[in-house]
Amino acid sequence: MNEGNKFIRRHDLTSLIRLTIAYKAIFAMAEKQRGTITKLAKDFLISRTFVYMLANSLLETSQIKANDFFPPAIKENSSIDHILSLRLEGKCSIGSISTYLKRFGFKKSSVGYISQILNQFGSVLPNTVTLKEEETVKIVYASDEIFSKTKAILITADPISTAILKIEIVDKRTAEAWINHWETIEDNGCIPISLVCDGGTALIKGHKDYLSDLIRQHDTYHGIAHVLGIWDTRFEKNAYDAIEKEYDSNVVLNSEMDENKLTGIIKKYEESQKNTQEKIEAYESFHYLYVSMINELDIFDKKGKLRDRQKAEANIEACLDLLETEIELKKPVKKIRRILDDLLNYFEIAKVILEELLVKMPDIDEEGLRSLCLAWQWGKKKIKAKSPRRRRNCAQKEVYYYEEAEMFIAKEFGKVKDQVLKELNEIVQSSSIVECINSIIRPYLNSSKNQITQETLNLIMFYLNHRRYIAEKRKKQTPYELLTGQAQSKDWLDMLMEKYETNCH
């Protein structure tokens, strides 16, 4: 099969076979036989949607009025596929789905019916990812809290596979709620090797009471960039505003005016010049310290060697001292100092990973390993880069160091590269994956008018874990495949329908 083709013409499915499939499907739905559609799909290696399509085609070409002879099973099942696809893939509101179904002649199209269908399907799904019996995976927990109006939602994801491990609505955000949350994940086979989260009180206490033997990595984005980024923008805006005022004063000065007013105008212009210079210097000083602190988060130096954690912490502390004394930023500095002890914990994880790599691959060229480390680091920066220019620069550096690594590691370079990157990806600096998932989930919450239910969250989690990526490095893979290493042969919608039919049966 050509991997690039999503659909292919099945020449082995003759007209007679298609007619047989359609007839059996119509009969099964008329008799309300559960599981027949799924069995037909399995027996003939086709999708359930294709089975319904054949059944509909037979009814139309035979000019049979389904309502006169059979219950409206085909329309109902077909509308269910539409409901699930529109809600999860299209992120449509229930009201919009109702309008769509009415337009295309589906009888059961009321808001109440759609809500009932979504609730029924969500009720048969767990809110925790489930592995096969006795199967376990060791992963990083990236945990955070999101909100739907007053409802708190706890979510934990695997930052490497992007799979949602658990999502649940809770009454209160307490340490006990987080402990129960993590216990359930662990009971289902996902063993934590470290925890990445922000500085939430309940999260910190939950870690202390339940996961104290694991490293807790504070989110580096929330630790520095989130705190100081807004100040960087503010200082820059102040500088540009001052430049604009100076320019306006200069225009007035160069225009014709009474000599009696000239002295006052000159004085005002000189004040504008002085103010502009002060604002520019303030911005440049702050920006230099801000960028210096961000650079201290790098794991590897310019030669690809692991940086010293103590030196990095000392440099950040020196920058904080200057921000406090010279620029007088008291509160932001205090906030960063509060979490500084946990901010660079990933250095310890990186140290262990590099040691394990040298044990697993004793013959690896050390220069080549350093080049791979730099390529990996520039790849991470490329993902984080916001400006196209910055992104291009990072991409060029990434390619350069991969090429350099290949010069040192000529033999089985692809295999060595994949192994090294797999290990390095376990170094997690932030819980940005949860922020990303939050941005994906937010449209569902908004289209629900924030009347979110656990059943809806179960559906969203199932879809996000089993839908296939269509671009970037995870292209053609699903989060669940990446988490478990097991191939997923079916579409998420077929899997969901089968799961529903099995549970109902």
PLM region spans:
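Charged, amphipathic alpha-helical linkers/stalks
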Residues: 220-307
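Basic, short loop/linker segments at the boundary and entry of helix-turn-helix/winged-helix-like folds
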Residues: 3-24, 41-88, 136
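C-terminal domain-tail junction helix/linker
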Residues: 277-307, 368-390, 397-416, 420-431, ...
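Mobile genetic element proteins and their domesticated derivatives, centered on retroelements
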Residues: 21, 40, 51-54, 83, ...
